[in-house]
Amino acid sequence: MGTIESYLTNSYNYIIFNFKKLCIGGLMSAIVGAMSGVTTAFIDLFMERANYDIMHIIMSFLIYFGIIFIIGLIVSAIIGGYNVRIMKTTVEGLNVAPDWNNITDLLYRGILYIVGLVLLNIIFYFIPAILFVFGIFSLYISKIIGAFLIIISILIFIISVISLWLYSKLAEVNYSVKGFYGFFEFKEIFKMIGIRYIILVIIIAIINFIISLIVVLPLNIIDIFISYSALANSILTIIYISIKGISYALSTFVDFYLGVFSIRAVALYYKDRKGIT
Protein backbone atom coordinates (compact mmCIF):
# COMPACT_ATOMS: atom_id res chain seq x y z
CA MET A 1 0.00 0.00 0.00
CA GLY A 2 1.50 3.31 -1.09
CA THR A 3 1.77 6.44 1.00
CA ILE A 4 0.47 9.93 0.27
CA GLU A 5 4.05 11.06 -0.24
CA SER A 6 4.69 8.27 -2.75
CA TYR A 7 1.57 9.19 -4.76
CA LEU A 8 2.61 12.84 -4.94
CA THR A 9 6.27 12.07 -5.72
CA ASN A 10 5.33 9.57 -8.40
CA SER A 11 2.92 12.06 -10.01
CA TYR A 12 5.58 14.78 -10.03
CA ASN A 13 8.17 12.45 -11.57
CA TYR A 14 5.60 11.32 -14.13
CA ILE A 15 5.15 14.89 -15.34
CA ILE A 16 8.90 15.57 -15.47
CA PHE A 17 9.63 12.32 -17.33
CA ASN A 18 6.77 12.80 -19.83
CA PHE A 19 6.88 16.60 -20.06
CA LYS A 20 7.43 16.78 -23.85
CA LYS A 21 4.65 14.33 -24.69
CA LEU A 22 2.26 16.05 -22.28
CA CYS A 23 3.20 19.41 -23.79
CA ILE A 24 0.73 18.78 -26.64
CA GLY A 25 -2.16 19.03 -24.20
CA GLY A 26 -0.63 22.05 -22.51
CA LEU A 27 -0.26 23.90 -25.81
CA MET A 28 -3.81 23.08 -26.93
CA SER A 29 -5.11 24.42 -23.63
CA ALA A 30 -2.90 27.52 -23.91
CA ILE A 31 -4.14 28.37 -27.42
CA VAL A 32 -7.78 28.28 -26.34
CA GLY A 33 -6.84 30.18 -23.17
CA ALA A 34 -5.07 32.90 -25.16
CA MET A 35 -8.09 33.32 -27.45
CA SER A 36 -10.37 33.66 -24.43
CA GLY A 37 -8.00 36.13 -22.77
CA VAL A 38 -7.75 38.38 -25.83
CA THR A 39 -11.53 38.35 -26.23
CA THR A 40 -12.02 39.24 -22.57
CA ALA A 41 -9.55 42.12 -22.94
CA PHE A 42 -11.42 43.50 -25.96
CA ILE A 43 -14.69 43.36 -24.06
CA ASP A 44 -13.16 45.09 -21.03
CA LEU A 45 -11.81 47.90 -23.20
CA PHE A 46 -14.47 48.55 -25.79
CA MET A 47 -17.55 48.14 -23.61
CA GLU A 48 -16.36 51.29 -21.85
CA ARG A 49 -16.39 53.35 -25.04
CA ALA A 50 -19.70 55.23 -25.08
CA ASN A 51 -19.34 56.14 -28.78
CA TYR A 52 -19.53 52.49 -29.86
CA ASP A 53 -22.72 50.70 -30.84
CA ILE A 54 -23.07 48.49 -27.77
CA MET A 55 -25.47 46.04 -29.42
CA HIS A 56 -23.15 45.65 -32.41
CA ILE A 57 -20.24 44.94 -30.07
CA ILE A 58 -22.27 42.44 -28.06
CA MET A 59 -23.41 40.57 -31.18
CA SER A 60 -19.89 40.49 -32.61
CA PHE A 61 -18.44 39.10 -29.40
CA LEU A 62 -21.27 36.60 -29.01
CA ILE A 63 -20.39 35.17 -32.42
CA TYR A 64 -16.70 35.14 -31.54
CA PHE A 65 -17.41 33.58 -28.15
CA GLY A 66 -19.54 30.96 -29.89
CA ILE A 67 -16.59 30.01 -32.08
CA ILE A 68 -14.23 29.91 -29.08
CA PHE A 69 -16.79 27.85 -27.14
CA ILE A 70 -16.99 25.23 -29.89
CA ILE A 71 -13.20 25.08 -30.25
CA GLY A 72 -12.84 24.95 -26.46
CA LEU A 73 -15.41 22.15 -26.22
CA ILE A 74 -13.58 20.06 -28.83
CA VAL A 75 -10.22 20.67 -27.13
CA SER A 76 -11.73 19.86 -23.72
CA ALA A 77 -13.13 16.60 -25.10
CA ILE A 78 -9.76 15.62 -26.59
CA ILE A 79 -7.91 16.47 -23.38
CA GLY A 80 -10.60 14.71 -21.34
CA GLY A 81 -10.14 11.60 -23.48
CA TYR A 82 -6.39 11.81 -22.99
CA ASN A 83 -6.84 12.14 -19.22
CA VAL A 84 -8.91 8.96 -19.33
CA ARG A 85 -5.96 7.23 -21.01
CA ILE A 86 -3.60 8.54 -18.35
CA MET A 87 -5.80 7.20 -15.55
CA LYS A 88 -6.26 3.83 -17.25
CA THR A 89 -2.55 3.33 -17.97
CA THR A 90 -1.71 4.44 -14.43
CA VAL A 91 -3.98 1.76 -12.97
CA GLU A 92 -2.32 -0.71 -15.35
CA GLY A 93 1.04 0.20 -13.82
CA LEU A 94 2.57 2.13 -16.73
CA ASN A 95 4.85 5.12 -16.10
CA VAL A 96 5.01 6.32 -19.70
CA ALA A 97 2.37 8.81 -20.82
CA PRO A 98 0.01 7.46 -23.52
CA ASP A 99 0.25 8.64 -27.12
CA TRP A 100 -2.00 11.28 -28.65
CA ASN A 101 -3.03 8.92 -31.46
CA ASN A 102 -6.57 8.00 -32.58
CA ILE A 103 -8.17 11.41 -32.10
CA THR A 104 -11.62 9.94 -32.75
CA ASP A 105 -11.22 7.67 -29.73
CA LEU A 106 -10.02 10.59 -27.60
CA LEU A 107 -13.05 12.66 -28.64
CA TYR A 108 -15.44 9.79 -27.94
CA ARG A 109 -14.01 9.03 -24.50
CA GLY A 110 -13.73 12.73 -23.74
CA ILE A 111 -17.37 13.41 -24.60
CA LEU A 112 -18.49 10.51 -22.39
CA TYR A 113 -16.17 11.88 -19.69
CA ILE A 114 -17.84 15.30 -19.83
CA VAL A 115 -21.35 13.80 -19.99
CA GLY A 116 -20.60 11.57 -17.00
CA LEU A 117 -19.40 14.52 -14.90
CA VAL A 118 -22.45 16.59 -15.89
CA LEU A 119 -24.77 13.74 -14.86
CA LEU A 120 -22.96 13.41 -11.53
CA ASN A 121 -23.50 17.12 -10.89
CA ILE A 122 -27.21 16.74 -11.64
CA ILE A 123 -27.51 13.70 -9.35
CA PHE A 124 -25.70 15.30 -6.41
CA TYR A 125 -27.35 18.72 -6.68
CA PHE A 126 -30.88 17.63 -7.62
CA ILE A 127 -32.25 17.30 -4.08
CA PRO A 128 -30.87 20.60 -2.67
CA ALA A 129 -32.01 22.42 -5.83
CA ILE A 130 -35.56 21.05 -5.53
CA LEU A 131 -35.70 21.85 -1.81
CA PHE A 132 -34.46 25.39 -2.45
CA VAL A 133 -37.14 25.99 -5.11
CA PHE A 134 -39.83 24.59 -2.81
CA GLY A 135 -38.49 26.81 -0.04
CA ILE A 136 -38.77 29.93 -2.21
CA PHE A 137 -42.37 29.15 -3.16
CA SER A 138 -43.22 28.15 0.43
CA LEU A 139 -42.29 31.64 1.60
CA TYR A 140 -45.54 32.88 0.05
CA ILE A 141 -47.50 30.37 2.19
CA SER A 142 -45.47 30.28 5.41
CA LYS A 143 -42.27 32.19 6.01
CA ILE A 144 -41.20 29.75 8.74
CA ILE A 145 -41.62 26.66 6.54
CA GLY A 146 -40.04 28.44 3.57
CA ALA A 147 -37.03 29.61 5.58
CA PHE A 148 -36.64 26.12 7.08
CA LEU A 149 -36.60 24.47 3.64
CA ILE A 150 -34.10 27.02 2.32
CA ILE A 151 -31.74 26.46 5.28
CA ILE A 152 -32.03 22.67 4.89
CA SER A 153 -31.36 22.97 1.14
CA ILE A 154 -28.22 25.05 1.80
CA LEU A 155 -26.92 22.52 4.33
CA ILE A 156 -27.59 19.63 1.94
CA PHE A 157 -25.95 21.65 -0.85
CA ILE A 158 -22.75 22.04 1.20
CA ILE A 159 -22.73 18.31 1.94
CA SER A 160 -23.35 17.59 -1.76
CA VAL A 161 -20.45 19.83 -2.83
CA ILE A 162 -18.01 18.02 -0.52
CA SER A 163 -19.40 14.59 -1.42
CA LEU A 164 -19.19 15.25 -5.16
CA TRP A 165 -15.67 16.65 -4.83
CA LEU A 166 -14.49 13.47 -3.12
CA TYR A 167 -16.58 11.05 -5.18
CA SER A 168 -16.03 12.43 -8.69
CA LYS A 169 -12.24 12.00 -8.68
CA LEU A 170 -12.45 8.27 -7.96
CA ALA A 171 -15.45 7.96 -10.30
CA GLU A 172 -13.33 9.37 -13.12
CA VAL A 173 -10.69 6.69 -12.58
CA ASN A 174 -13.40 4.03 -12.30
CA TYR A 175 -14.80 5.21 -15.65
CA SER A 176 -11.38 4.92 -17.29
CA VAL A 177 -11.16 1.29 -16.13
CA LYS A 178 -14.75 0.04 -16.42
CA GLY A 179 -16.41 2.31 -18.96
CA PHE A 180 -19.25 4.83 -18.70
CA TYR A 181 -21.22 3.02 -15.99
CA GLY A 182 -18.13 3.21 -13.79
CA PHE A 183 -19.22 6.76 -12.97
CA PHE A 184 -22.25 5.46 -11.11
CA GLU A 185 -20.95 2.64 -8.90
CA PHE A 186 -21.79 4.70 -5.84
CA LYS A 187 -21.53 2.02 -3.17
CA GLU A 188 -18.18 0.72 -4.40
CA ILE A 189 -16.63 4.17 -4.84
CA PHE A 190 -17.81 5.58 -1.52
CA LYS A 191 -16.24 2.55 0.20
CA MET A 192 -12.88 3.63 -1.22
CA ILE A 193 -13.07 7.07 0.41
CA GLY A 194 -11.04 7.05 3.61
CA ILE A 195 -8.98 9.45 5.70
CA ARG A 196 -5.87 8.84 3.59
CA TYR A 197 -7.76 9.68 0.42
CA ILE A 198 -9.32 12.82 1.92
CA ILE A 199 -5.89 14.05 3.07
CA LEU A 200 -4.48 13.30 -0.40
CA VAL A 201 -7.07 15.34 -2.31
CA ILE A 202 -6.82 18.23 0.18
CA ILE A 203 -3.03 18.35 -0.29
CA ILE A 204 -3.47 18.20 -4.07
CA ALA A 205 -5.97 21.09 -3.92
CA ILE A 206 -3.57 23.19 -1.82
CA ILE A 207 -0.65 22.48 -4.19
CA ASN A 208 -2.77 23.38 -7.23
CA PHE A 209 -4.00 26.60 -5.61
CA ILE A 210 -0.52 27.78 -4.59
CA ILE A 211 1.06 27.04 -7.98
CA SER A 212 -1.81 28.69 -9.88
CA LEU A 213 -1.55 31.76 -7.65
CA ILE A 214 2.22 32.05 -8.16
CA VAL A 215 1.89 31.72 -11.93
CA VAL A 216 -1.02 34.09 -12.54
CA LEU A 217 -0.82 36.71 -9.76
CA PRO A 218 2.13 38.78 -11.12
CA LEU A 219 0.48 39.18 -14.54
CA ASN A 220 -2.88 39.98 -12.95
CA ILE A 221 -1.32 42.76 -10.87
CA ILE A 222 0.27 44.30 -13.99
CA ASP A 223 -3.05 43.83 -15.78
CA ILE A 224 -4.93 45.84 -13.13
CA PHE A 225 -2.53 48.79 -13.26
CA ILE A 226 -2.44 48.97 -17.06
CA SER A 227 -6.21 48.57 -17.55
CA TYR A 228 -6.93 52.05 -16.15
CA SER A 229 -4.78 53.75 -18.80
CA ALA A 230 -5.16 51.29 -21.68
CA LEU A 231 -7.98 53.18 -23.41
CA ALA A 232 -6.03 56.44 -23.51
CA ASN A 233 -2.89 55.00 -25.11
CA SER A 234 -2.70 52.67 -28.13
CA ILE A 235 0.59 51.12 -26.96
CA LEU A 236 -0.85 50.40 -23.53
CA THR A 237 -3.92 48.93 -25.25
CA ILE A 238 -1.74 46.45 -27.13
CA ILE A 239 0.22 45.65 -23.96
CA TYR A 240 -3.00 45.14 -21.99
CA ILE A 241 -4.49 42.78 -24.58
CA SER A 242 -1.19 40.90 -24.85
CA ILE A 243 -0.87 40.48 -21.08
CA LYS A 244 -4.47 39.26 -20.88
CA GLY A 245 -3.80 36.69 -23.59
CA ILE A 246 -0.51 35.57 -22.03
CA SER A 247 -2.09 35.37 -18.57
CA TYR A 248 -4.93 33.14 -19.77
CA ALA A 249 -2.59 31.03 -21.92
CA LEU A 250 -0.11 30.51 -19.09
CA SER A 251 -2.89 29.73 -16.64
CA THR A 252 -4.49 27.08 -18.86
CA PHE A 253 -1.08 25.62 -19.78
CA VAL A 254 -0.19 25.15 -16.11
CA ASP A 255 -3.72 23.96 -15.28
CA PHE A 256 -3.31 21.09 -17.75
CA TYR A 257 -0.18 19.84 -15.98
CA LEU A 258 -1.79 20.31 -12.57
CA GLY A 259 -4.73 18.27 -13.83
CA VAL A 260 -2.40 15.46 -14.92
CA PHE A 261 -0.68 15.61 -11.53
CA SER A 262 -4.04 15.30 -9.76
CA ILE A 263 -5.52 12.43 -11.78
CA ARG A 264 -2.25 10.50 -11.65
CA ALA A 265 -2.13 10.71 -7.84
CA VAL A 266 -5.78 9.68 -7.45
CA ALA A 267 -5.36 6.84 -9.97
CA LEU A 268 -2.39 5.52 -7.96
CA TYR A 269 -4.54 5.56 -4.82
CA TYR A 270 -7.34 3.76 -6.72
CA LYS A 271 -4.86 1.16 -7.94
CA ASP A 272 -3.71 0.46 -4.37
CA ARG A 273 -7.24 0.26 -2.97
CA LYS A 274 -8.18 -2.21 -5.68
CA GLY A 275 -5.07 -4.26 -4.93
CA ILE A 276 -3.95 -4.09 -8.56
CA THR A 277 -0.29 -4.99 -9.04
UniProtKB/Swiss-Prot annotation:
The chain crosses the membrane at residues 23-43, 61-81, 117-137, 144-164, 197-217, 221-241, 243-263. GO terms for cellular component: plasma membrane. InterPro entries: DUF4013. The keyword Kinase does not apply. Coiled coil: none annotated. Keywords: Cell membrane, Membrane, Transmembrane, Transmembrane helix. It is a multi-pass membrane protein. It is found in: Cell membrane. Its main location: membrane. To M.jannaschii MJ1189. This is Uncharacterized protein MJ0233.
